[in-house]
Structures are given as structure tokens and as C-alpha cells.
């Protein structure tokens, strides 16, 4: 079955965690797009009321406005009830790789601002160890690009500058560049995250560690909810 159908099913199921009156983080990417359409439908028919969103990208903000989803900012609402977003890889501890959509900095800020962070994904995004399938995106300031690339290579990565469809360097909403780094299997995500953060010029990386409360996974056998280790009984 098509991964898009699983993404849609995961997004629809995740919306069960949204309650009227909530302020929620709105993710970026293909799964988040399904969530936005589902949220808009629930607001339109009255199943949900007074839900306000904080978008994680300009793309998400534009679509939310088009769909009639009320928006706010973290300046006005610094504490969110819930954040909903997709992921590029999810391991059994709900550690994530995110950022292939180019919005990881805002995504991480929004997720950290939420009381609960619910991840939505097709079962194909589940891995035993991070790095099995996805490169690790690292957002860097343009001035620091040469240094960041050298330091990331020294850490064992193979950094490649992300480019847009025209072949020009991809520029994030914050005006930064992204190095997609192939580290292979990441044996110690926490140690790697700390090492990357110590590189001058790094703005953000795609390792989301200890942030997800719940993962909603859709596959051929239906929907599964995976709870973070700290939330398990």
C-alpha cells in the first residue's frame, strides 16, 4: 500500500489528541500537510472549535491560512498544548531524525514549547537505529559553511550542501544553509548531538532526542501508538 495513505491515516489518528480550545504546533512536510487538511475539516464542521496553530515554516503558515486555520505566534502563546509533526526516522526510544523538509530549527523550537509532542509517520520511517536510511540535516550559517563542513566530516559525516530544484543552495526560512550528513548508523545519538552543537556556525541539527511523547505509526496492520520510554508504565 502507498506510504501516502499511511501518512494520511497517521495524521488523521493523531488529530484525536487535539481538543477544542488548544493551541498547537503545526509541523512541516507531507504528513503534516495531511494533518492540516484534517484539522481544517474538523474546524469547518464543528468537531473542533477555538483551535489555534503555531506554524513551523512559511509553507505551513501559507497553507494553514488558505485552509482557514487560525494562527498565532510563540510571542503571543509561548506555551503550547500539543505539537504535531512528522519524522524522517524514528527509533524504538522515539528518538528522531527530522529536517529533510528544511524546517528543523522552527520544528524543534515549537516541539520544545509544547506540553506534548506527537509524531505522525508511516511504518517505513521506523528504524532500529538512527541513520539507517536518512542523512542527518545540519543547519549552518553561510559564513561558517567551510568550517562546519570540515568539522562534520571530522566527526565521521559526509556533508553535502542541500540544493533546491534549480540547483541553487537551499535557504531555510531563517536564511541559513543545510548540510545533509551521512553518518551511517549513529551509535550514540546523544554524543553526536553534543559534538555537532559545539561546532561554531551550527544553528540546529535534525536529531530530536527525548522530545517526542508519542508516535502514531500507520502501516498495513493498522495504527500503533508508541509511547516514549519515560511515559511507559
Swiss-Prot record:
**Active site feature:** 107
Keywords associated with the record: Isomerase
From the UniProt record, give one GO term of the biological process aspect. Answer: pentose-phosphate shunt, non-oxidative branch
The EC number of this protein is 5.3.1.6
* Keyword flag Glycoprotein: no
Residue positions annotated to bind substrate are 28-31, 85-88, 98-101, 125
Task: State which pathway it belongs to.
Answer: Carbohydrate degradation; pentose phosphate pathway; D-ribose 5-phosphate from D-ribulose 5-phosphate (non-oxidative stage): step 1/1
The protein's matches in CDD domains, at most eight in alphabetical order, are given as:
RPI_A
Q: Which Pfam families match?
A: Rib_5-P_isom_A (PF06026)
Biological role stated in the UniProt entry: Catalyzes the reversible conversion of ribose-5-phosphate to ribulose 5-phosphate.
Q: Which NCBIfam families match?
A: PRK00702.1, rpiA
Family of the protein in this entry: Belongs to the ribose 5-phosphate isomerase family.
Assembly, per entry: Homodimer.
Q: What is this protein called?
A: Ribose-5-phosphate isomerase A
Q: Which organism is it from?
A: Roseiflexus sp. (strain RS-1)
**Gene that this sequence comes from:** rpiA
Amino acid at each position: 500500500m502507498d506510504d501516502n495513505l499511511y501518512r494520511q491515516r497517521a495524521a488523521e489518528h493523531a488529530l484525536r489528541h487535539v481538543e477544542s480550545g488548544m493551541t498547537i504546533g503545526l509541523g512541516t512536510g507531507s504528513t503534516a500537510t495531511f494533518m492540516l487538511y484534517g484539522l481544517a475539516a474538523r474546524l469547518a464542521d464543528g468537531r473542533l472549535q477555538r483551535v489555534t496553530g503555531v506554524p513551523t515554516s512559511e509553507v505551513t503558515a501559507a497553507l494553514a491560512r488558505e485552509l482557514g486555520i487560525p494562527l498565532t505566534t510563540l510571542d503571543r502563546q509561548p506555551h503550547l498544548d500539543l505539537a504535531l509533526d512528522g519524522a524522517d526516522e524514528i527509533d524504538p526510544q522515539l528518538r528522531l531524525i527530522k529536517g529533510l523538509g528544511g524546517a528543523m530549527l522552527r520544528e524543534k523550537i515549537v516541539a520544545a514549547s509544547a506540553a506534548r509532542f506527537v509524531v505522525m509517520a508511516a511504518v517505513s520511517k521506523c528504524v532500529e537505529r538512527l541513520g539507517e536510511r536518512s542523512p542527518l540535516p545540519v543547519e549552518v550559517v553561510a559564513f561558517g559553511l567551510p568550517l562546519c563542513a570540515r568539522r562534520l566530516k571530522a566527526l565521521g559525516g559526509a556533508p553535502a550542501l542541500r540544493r533546491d530544484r534549480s540547483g541553487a543552495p537551499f535557504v531555510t526560512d531563517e536564511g541559513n544553509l543545510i548540510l545533509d550528513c551521512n553518518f551511517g548508523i549513529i551509535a550514540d545519538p546523544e554524543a553526536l548531538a553534543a559534538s555537532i552543537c559545539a561546532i561554531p556556525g551550527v544553528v540546529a541539527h535534525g536529531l530530536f532526542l527525548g522530545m517526542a511523547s508519542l508516535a502514531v505509526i500507520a502501516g498495513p496492520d493498522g495504527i500503533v501508538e508508541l509511547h516514549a520510554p519515560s511515559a511507559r508504565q
